[in-house]
Amino acid sequence: MKKVVLLILDGFGINTKTPEENAIVQANTPTFDKIFPLLQTQLDASGRSVWLPDGQMWNSEVWHMTIGTWRINKQSLVEIEDMLDDGSFAKLEWYKWAIEHCQKNDSSLHLLQLFWPGWVHAMDSHLEKILKLIPSDIKVFLHLFWDGRDLAPNSLLPLMQSFEKKLHEFPNVQIASLAGRYFAMDRDNNRERIQKAYDEIIFSQFQTSDTPSEYIAKSYEKWIMDEFIEPISFVGYDQICSWDSIIFLNFRSDRARQMTQALMVSMHPELKFEYPKRSRHFITKQITNMY
């Protein structure tokens, strides 16, 4: 019986197209120089080969899962992207229920999401495609959270400026509130942080007449960067009303869990959040339980 060794070298890749950019190629590696000619194949650990967007490496979780299961695992962001592109997203039972519920009760739809061009917790392109699916007779309120950790800490102002222009195509859509992820996506039971973002989503406690871009720019002037932007709501938004539907669009659950529990507080009395005594229909879906 032949013995097999699985040797994992972190950061050790094969790049022959631009060897001047590959430290391994430039280094003196006599042992690997002997081993490489004996290799029978190469593995691609990025892009669609591991069910990620083309050209993306993402993070080590993908590789851990692929190595551990020895198969390609569908990654949430790509599966959602494919479903939005082929039309199957609009056929999901929970999505159809949320839309029909709003139409039946003449109520609003609230979408919550980390808004950024990355792919760890959510993707802004998903939000834009979902907005195109929603019937124009439904009022849509967006509750957007800023990153500031996986991107530069002040990178989202131009993204918001661009998004505000795109929203002219959707007269039924309004940005209702903003919050840095420090508040809205805490996962360490700092409930006072979640409370501040929750109060804006539920009660619209502190309103500003600024546009979202203006509010972000003023925050930057105070050296308050994306992650720590204070929760705020905007003129034109009141609060979550009876029979509204809520969909949390983050596909990674760890930093969506506490806000979800807060919004579902009537089902979790141990959580010390105030909440309006009214019916709220809340939907939070990860790709793993969309079916």
Language-model-detected regions and their locations in the chain:
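Active-site nucleophile/metal-coordination loop of metallo-enzymes that catalyze phosphate/sulfate
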Residues: K2-V5, F12-Y182, E192, K196, ...
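Short, hydrophobic/glycine-enriched beta-strand segments
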Residues: K3-D10, I246-N250
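Short, exposed beta-strand "edge-strand" segments with a Pro/Gly-rich flavor and a Y/T-containing core
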Residues: I24-Q26, D86-A90, F203-D210, I246
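Long, well-ordered, tryptophan-enriched scaffold segments
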Residues: L151, P158-C241, F251-A256, M264-P276, ...
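Active-site lining segments that contact anionic ligands and/or coordinate catalytic metals
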Residues: W243-I246, I287
